């Protein structure tokens, strides 16, 4: 698997970067990749089918100049920004392997990530804490969420990407997001302030844990610039896409 640690200048380009990796692999010009990125400024990302007005405090975002974008994968709405580390996995779909179906891929990827991050944090937590996969694709620490994840599939490859809250300003979530319309049972109607936590590891520790877990030891120098420009122009810079629901 190849490794790319690259943050692009804008939110639109970073979302397009994940999708471009998937498109490149599907076209036969790429393969399995682990990418990291972290936005230097806050923005809101809604899941593909989310309704912006139902999930986002649109007026507050507008007043503060915080962009609202839509990603190509499912899942819920999140706030991005400094202290929120993003990863993206491009994996080959094989019918007889754990990537063969949506549910199998969710279980396989989430458990591998859980084990890797729990191991990285174990030496720092006294007393020991419980790391679990909860909901469909959440990672929790003692029942508090620190990672949300989503999947997008093509015929030959899938994109599985997510966030890791490390030293993020969690107050932004309550300011910018409404209570989600769909909630996992384990949330138990808790508000954002009582539902989220940070993973107590450094960026380098989190990255190293996932790099080792996925054996991403072959460097990838760059993202496909032409495809990114096309995706930004066609989708991620357009209100027709970002506010389609």
Where are these regions (language model features)?
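N-terminal lobe of the biotin/lipoate ligase/transferase fold
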Residues: 1-100
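Short Gly/Ser/Thr- and Asp/Glu-enriched loop/turn motifs at secondary-structure junctions
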Residues: 39-41, 132-136
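Long, positively charged amphipathic alpha-helical accessory segments at protein N-termini or as interdomain linkers
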Residues: 104-131, 147-245
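Glycine- and Gly-Pro-enriched alpha-helical subdomains that act as flexible
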Residues: 138-141
């Amino acid at each position: 698997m190849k490794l790319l640690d690259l943050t692009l200048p804008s939110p639109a380009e970073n979302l397009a970067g994940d999708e471009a990796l998937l498109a490149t692999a599907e076209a036969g010009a790429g393969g399995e990749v682990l990418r990291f990125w972290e936005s230097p400024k806050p923005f809101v990302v809604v899941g593909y089918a989310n309704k912006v007005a139902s999930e986002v405090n649109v007026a507050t975002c507008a007043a503060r100049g915080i962009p609202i974008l839509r990603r190509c994968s499912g899942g819920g709405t999140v706030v991005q920004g400094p202290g929120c580390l993003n990863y993206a996995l491009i994996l080959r779909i094989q019918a007889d392997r754990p990537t063969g179906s949506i549910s199998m891929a969710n279980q396989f990827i989430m458990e591998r990530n859980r084990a890797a991050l729990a191991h990285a944090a174990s030496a720092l937590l006294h007393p020991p804490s419980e790391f679990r996969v909860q909901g469909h694709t959440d990672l929790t620490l003692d029942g508090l969420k620190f990672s949300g994840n989503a999947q997008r599939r093509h015929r030959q490859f899938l994109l599985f990407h997510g966030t890791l809250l490390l030293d993020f300003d969690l107050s932004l979530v309550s300011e910018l997001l409404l209570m989600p319309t769909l909630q996992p049972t384990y949330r138990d109607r808790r508000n954002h302030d009582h539902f989220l936590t940070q993973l107590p590891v450094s960026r380098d520790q989190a990255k190293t844990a996932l790099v080792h877990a996925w054996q991403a030891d072959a460097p990838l120098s760059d993202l496909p610039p032409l495809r990114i420009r096309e995706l930004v122009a066609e989708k991620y810079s357009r209100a027709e896409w970002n506010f389609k629901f």
